[in-house]
Design a protein with these regions (language model features):
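Positively charged, small/polar-rich N-terminal and surface patches that mediate targeting and assembly
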Residues: 1-109
Length: 109
């Protein structure tokens, strides 16, 4: 199989208790040029233990694409404005198609 040229980007996910909060977070991070783009999906059903009790809640998942250069500032902004006491924040490096990855890693449009 032929390999596709790629560029490395970061992808991060977090969750919110309302679609409005999820959309607001993406809007804020994109407008500040900290994330290049984001998607909201949900509701999703989350199962977890909180304060010793099993919980099941509906949440909205936000997936963000951003550059290594913006990681620290994006995380600072997200943490400062996220409504949860403990935010889910999972980040991984991904290989993206060259044109898309270059766009994600570029400066403000």
């Amino acid at each position: 199989m032929e390999s596709i040229d790629s560029v490395r980007i970061l992808v991060g996910t977090t969750t919110f208790s309302s679609k409005e909060d999820a959309v607001s977070a993406i809007d804020q991070l994109v407008r500040k040029n900290l994330a290049k783009c984001g998607q909201v999906d949900g509701p999703i059903e989350s199962h977890y233990i909180w304060e010793g009790e099993k919980q099941v809640t509906l949440e909205w998942r936000v997936t963000l694409k951003f550059s290594h250069a913006n990681k620290k500032n994006l995380e600072t902004e997200l943490k400062a404005n996220h409504p949860y006491d403990i935010q889910q924040w999972v980040v991984w490096e991904a290989k993206a198609e060259v044109k898309y990855g270059s766009w994600v890693n570029s400066g403000p449009d």
